[in-house]
Amino acid sequence: MTNEIRNELQLMTNALRDKIQIEKVILFGSQAYGNPKEDSDIDLCIITEENKRKIELIREIRRIIKPYKTHSMDILVYNLKEFSEKSNNFAGIEKTINEKGVLIYG
């Protein structure tokens, strides 16, 4: 992860912490695993304790980070219980995020 990406993620995380109740922010994908290409996007997993519908939460997160976002970004959002269950019980993306992702906050 470059310093530019690290700074962008820090600004976004700080903005999110001021507005919503986040437990963790995890970077995953090529930026986290050390093999990004020039046009690679940023893959983020945001784990929260908010009791809002997921679609509403994603919209709110996108609105909050928009002023700081300079790269293309994919965002996955989970509540803490959901992420814990999926990362422990399945061989899916949640397990990979939990094992290989880079913890940005939490």
Language model features: what each stretch is:
Residues M1-K24, Y33-E38, E49-G106:
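Catalytic core of pol beta-like nucleotidyltransferases
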Residues F28-S30:
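Glycine-rich beta-strand-to-loop/alpha-helix junction loops that act as flexible
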Residues S40-I42:
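Short, conserved active-site loops that position catalytic residues or coordinate cofactors/metal ions
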Residues C45-I47:
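Short hydrophobic/aromatic beta-strand micro-patches
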